[in-house]
Amino acid sequence: MTSMADVIILSSSPHPPRSPGPGRHDTKPVSHALPRSATPPPIRSTSDLSQPHTRSRFFPTPVASNKCPDGASKPKKRLTKDPASETSKQTAPSKPRREAKKVAGAPGTTALGEPQPEAVGKKNDAVKPTKSRSRRNAKSKDSGNMTLAGKVTKTSGDLPSKKSSKGGKKTVATKLSPSEDTSEKSTPKESNALGKDEVLRLDEAMRRRMDWTPPRETAYEEIATVTDRGSQDQDRDSSSSGGFGKLVSDYNYSGSALHPRDFVQNANGEGPTKRRRIELVNPEIQALLNGRYSDSSDQSSGQGENTGKPKKTTKGKPKKFTTLTARMTAQYSKNDAEEDEPVIDCLAGIRTTKGRQKKAKEIEKQSSSTVLSPEAAVEFLNDQDLIFGSCSQLEKDDSPETLRETQQAIRVPEGPSYSKGTHNKDPSAIQESSTRFVSKLAGTRNLWCVGARDTEGSLIQPETLNVVDLTNGEESPGKKSQDDAENPSHNTLQSDWYELEFADIDSPSEKRPSPLPTESVLDSDTQVQAPAPIPADTATATATATAVVKAAKPAKGANDTPTEAVDSQPASSQAPPMPQYTGFTDAELSKQVSSYGFKAVRGRKKMIDLLRQCWESKHGSGSNAASDSQLICQLEQQEEPASKMDNVPKSTSAAKTKATVKPKAGTSIRNRKSLDATKSTSASRTNLQTSPKKNSREKPITGTSTSFIDVEEIQDSEEEIIPSPSQVQKHYTDIYSKSKTGSWVQDHSLDILTKTPSPSPTKRKVVSSDIPAKRPPSSASIATTRMTESSKEISLAEISAQITQAVRLQPQLSPLSSSRGSRSRPTWHEKILMYDPIVLEDFTAWLNIEGLGLVGEDREVGTASVREWCESKGICCCWKKNAS
């Protein structure tokens, strides 16, 4: 009801008002947007609803003021500065003027909007048009639209004008009646005073409204400080009340974010620092500092002797740095007392200056003690022991004893495994070095020894190299000097291995026609019977034979003396017999091996071989001949599968294969008896010439007997008809390493030992006479040679054709397989054609046992050679360990 009363009062009508029809003209509402500070609009009059749609409701029509009564006062009102409304007013100024006249003269509008103001016909009607025209002309000259700021300026003190001002406050964003429109045109001069400034700000507002995101403030003069804060606030207040453009600028960051910075200023004027401001503002810290320095000033003024005590405490501070990193960074880091100095500076500091001087002196003293001249620094660097490690590790004592002990501990495992000058030392020195070496080995068992393996996966035993040195040290100086004089070019370790292999392989057939038949045949007999003591006996007899051969060739009668010496030597040294290692358990064998200073060896036979070699090097080689001859029968009975495996290529019937073991032992016994009875060279020659097959058959037997690796492995698997592939692999690897060296003995005249007895006795006679001269005194490196001599040294070109031929002949000539193979057990050729992975161990065992015998090839191949052959042919092969 108040809004309706306002409309009636603004119309300046003396008659009571009529309530307008509310629902008839609402069908055509004018779409508009209210300003932010606008109040809800009141009910509009009928004259307002009759206005055309193109006109803005914030701007009244200039023609409607002609009909106003005389007593109506014209309220002064600011208009909204809307650019859209401004443009609409500028484009069509005359058209609303004509429409306003029509609306004013319409009968329907007078009946609703104004209660017949023109029909009264008062005297003031002639006066009002002149005033309204002058106002209209002045309004047309104004530039820009006016903003409705929420208040109306007053031009007269009439009661209707006051009421109209109240109505203007309520209808800030509404369209007024024609009478109000004419009365509002009476305030152009006051609005023009502010309009000039507002026009300058409209450009900025337009620029910001195009982007709608206000750009970043770049004006530095707007940053607020403590000094110009009040002036800036005044400018902001005055500018914010200017217009819409400044209202948008108030939302920028520059105005609101500057207030916290005003409090950051330090008392000293050094700039905004958060930490110092907090320390200075806190009153508790100031109280504590004031109390502290009051006490310290009293103490310093009362006692002058106490000034030296802080120096002692400060000297102890560098001891806190326990790392190299802290020691180096201490020169550049501030102490805790130095960090308190900025707080102390703000207070009255008589004490602070003294403290600063003392700290500076202390820093100078520390730097003078650490900094050295270039020459002194170089000398210090040369004198100190370098230890590798990170600088962050805690420091230890800098004493040179600790560093030297550390370096000695580092160098101990890095030392050589054996001394190179052992061959030229006297026996006593050699024995001392040997005992020291054994103790050293006992102390240096680690993962490096465990990880020493060759290409085939078996362990490499570098400890056996030391057994050679020990054996060399145990022999007499006479033999040593003779060997050194005869073999000046064979003192290296590797050449000794090859020469030992020459002597052992050719001993059965080459010693018999020699001028000393008894000793040579005894060597062969001992080799056939005793696997372990062979090397030492062979070395002893060979050394004696070498001396006699070089001096002269005696007759038959002279041959008895060396024989008796050889026979009497075991009898005299038989007191400590070699223990029967074959009867020991695996745990006992490992304990015995560790007692000699060696690491644990994998495999029972390897441990037994190593223990026998160690026992021979310690107690002598001749003392164990008799005990080993007693043990040989038991060992050879346990070797039945191995001898069977060796003799399969030589014999085609199973009966001969089973009967080869006992004739071997019997042959050795008969040879010894015949040696004791006849002791003649002719008998040995007759034996060699009349039984060539037996000698050729004994050659592989000799190789098997000298191969220490097979003895105990066969014993472990003596109940098995076919040995395991790993045993077969090791067995044939050792045999082939000997076969390779046997071809070197005969000056490359023969490839490798063959089936047929082709070598002539005369040729063997020459070779046997030359071999003892080249043979070194030690023969304990045979096992080491077999471990290091792998079968890959065999020429692949020589045997690849035989392997290929054997694979193709298997279904035709193999007695153990079917004629064409079967689905459950295909032949090797069928497996290769079907691209089945060939297990190298099984294929090598078949070649050595059966395959190469089909093509008349007596040589045996190793797993490495078979692998090379498979890779050269493009055959898929794998190891059995990985295949499982």
Curated annotation (Swiss-Prot):
CDD domains: SAP_SLX4 (cd22999)
MF terms in GO: 5'-flap endonuclease activity
Assembly behavior: Forms a heterodimer with slx1.
Keywords: DNA damage, DNA recombination, DNA repair, Nucleus, Phosphoprotein
Entry function: Regulatory subunit of the slx1-slx4 structure-specific endonuclease that resolves DNA secondary structures generated during DNA repair and recombination. Has endonuclease activity towards branched DNA substrates, introducing single-strand cuts in duplex DNA close to junctions with ss-DNA.
Acetylation as UniProt keyword: no
Cellular component terms (Gene Ontology): Slx1-Slx4 complex
Similarity field: Belongs to the SLX4 family.
Listed InterPro entries: Slx4_ascomycetes, Structure-sp_endonuc_su_Slx4
Chain positions covered by the region annotation Disordered: 1-324, 394-434, 459-587, 618-707, 753-781
Protein name: Structure-specific endonuclease subunit slx4
UniProt record, GO biological process: DNA recombination; DNA repair; DNA replication
Top-level taxon of origin: Eukaryota
Low complexity bias: start-end ranges: 294-304, 535-558, 648-665
Composition-biased stretches (Basic residues): 309-320
Keyword DNA repair: yes
